[in-house]
Amino acid sequence: MQTRPGPGLHKIVVTDQDGGLGQFGGGAWLHDAALWPMDPSTGRPMLPIVMLTGLFLPTAYLPDDRVLTVFASIERSGGVDGRSSLRRLAVNQQGESDKLAQGHSKVLLHRRAAQEVCVGDSARLLGRHFIGLQPFDDHDMAEELEDEDSGAGMSKQLGRPCWLQDPIYMSPRYYFLAQFVEAELGRVDSGYAGLFGDGTGYLFADQRARKLGDGVAAGHFFIQFT
């Protein structure tokens, strides 16, 4: 049965069971392949990183028939992600926030199709894994509140980002939706190793997502690594 999580903060875990919350990797659930974002530098299809459904949060944050899919321009050559493409995705200090407008990642709000599609070389796709959520325990909450600038360092939904470099301050239009820790994903699937430069991916969603149309940008995604 597909249900929303309860109130409070949750860790993101990888599971074999589809609970209707979303998935890492795989293709994209696009009803129109023309919506698939292309890398502005190379013209090649971007890589789907994660898809989140409207059930991911305790309250409705998306229209009922929509999902958010995060795409990123990551070059994967011989199993190693090109450092140049990772640097384009990295926002390590506030002065680099202009990278968010350069189009090397896209948080796409779209209707969910009946099946996945793939544009380009399917061999480039990440392995598909379903998303699960586990409520924070007392230890997790203590870690979340311990530092003045950063929250807990696991993959999680909501809360505060755990910054690996400088804190990044976003426009009030966007809120922190989730962070994804590469090391946790890599322990489940070695194909994720190096995806974020051994770092973390940060997803910020548009406060207005419930009012936006189909096939539009509805947030920002970037990474930090040390």
Give, region by region, the residue ranges found by the protein language model:
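Preference for intrinsically disordered or flexible, low-complexity segments
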Residues: 1-226
